């Protein structure tokens, strides 16, 4: 494994490159061809909301010198993994109760496996991509690539000293393309970087690295700038239906195709700016980073799913769902979505939690993450209003005498707890003085 990462261009050999059609990968592909490698270009169709013409990307790769260029449709698999993440609650990062839906890690899990599988079909066993050494993606792609092809070698132009010396910046790469006859005009550089797929968009870096720079500099690509009072956003009533843990209908319209359902959920949530969040997170290498995230469809489905979870399952099941979801979210973030420990947690949630989730949730969406749940319907609900009704109920499930007995049984653990607190007070762990949290503890 020590020779897995190649620090110099493998001349005369096939090199697969994850090709986006942007400046970096265009310049890298042309440079590799000129330096003697045989580049093969692979483009993932992940339903990116900011991509207009996927079919044009492989043609562009061929023009830059690719031996062959393929467009790999990853949307169905991405939809499948996105729904699995919702079923498991695989989201470990949140601020103020608003989660980051791990949309980039989900995209990397799909891209890293499906592109390398396509390379294997072409007998391409060297892979390059645009991830940098400071980020998470370099490790995610490394893991998923080697899981898919254990014989894979990794070559990244951005880790090659010669490439960096010759084409180390955007200006140098643009001039390189122009000098080689390509009419390349650099786009106006934004104040931040954006990466997206069908499930969500990530905005980070540059100006957003400063915590004093707020979300308002971001131009949403999956919805509206809900903070702008000039943007008219009308309240909207929406229904979301699940069957056996799978979202199947929106506003009464059934979808046989998960991709189409997610795209419609994006449109609905996007009209309100639902699912946008500002997060500080810990990267895989433990350094903190900051990102602004969009995920309107994931947010809509997650809200409805969790409402059904709380109405159907008991407290202990919900607790395990949440704890395991945090663990699984972190594994997903680290590029371990297909590791045994992740598969174990996924199977647990999908079998014992998701299978019972059948029903319809009605919501009113307003601006941003402001919403109201209007109704929750399910044949599997264990919520029954009459069980705890404050009104007099015929044939009540329990009466005052029953509760007296239940409370009397609590005397055992209350007595044990008081004894333990007394021990803690005697040893100095707790103070029994007047202003203490437990001022009366020392009294008999």
UniProtKB/Swiss-Prot annotation:
Pathway: Amino-acid biosynthesis; L-arginine biosynthesis; L-arginine from L-ornithine and carbamoyl phosphate: step 2/3
Ligand binding (ATP): 18-26, 44, 130, 132, 137, 195
Record field: catalytic activity: L-citrulline + L-aspartate + ATP = 2-(N(omega)-L-arginino)succinate + AMP + diphosphate + H(+)
Class in the EC hierarchy, top level: ligase
GO MF term list: argininosuccinate synthase activity; ATP binding; protein homodimerization activity
Source taxon at top rank: Bacteria
Assigned GO CC terms: cytoplasm
CDD domains: ASS (cd01999)
Compartments it resides in: Cytoplasm
GO biological process: argininosuccinate metabolic process; L-arginine biosynthetic process; urea cycle
Primary localization: cytoplasm
Keywords: Amino-acid biosynthesis, Arginine biosynthesis, ATP-binding, Cytoplasm, Ligase, Nucleotide-binding
Alphabetized SUPFAM superfamilies for the sequence: Adenine nucleotide alpha hydrolases-like (SSF52402), Argininosuccinate synthetase, C-terminal domain (SSF69864)
Its EC number(s): 6.3.4.5
Pfam families, sorted: Arginosuc_syn_C, Arginosuc_synth
Quaternary structure (record): Homotetramer.
Family: Belongs to the argininosuccinate synthase family. Type 2 subfamily.
Cited NCBIfam families: argG (TIGR00032), PRK05370.1 (NF003779)
Protein name: Argininosuccinate synthase
Gene designation: argG
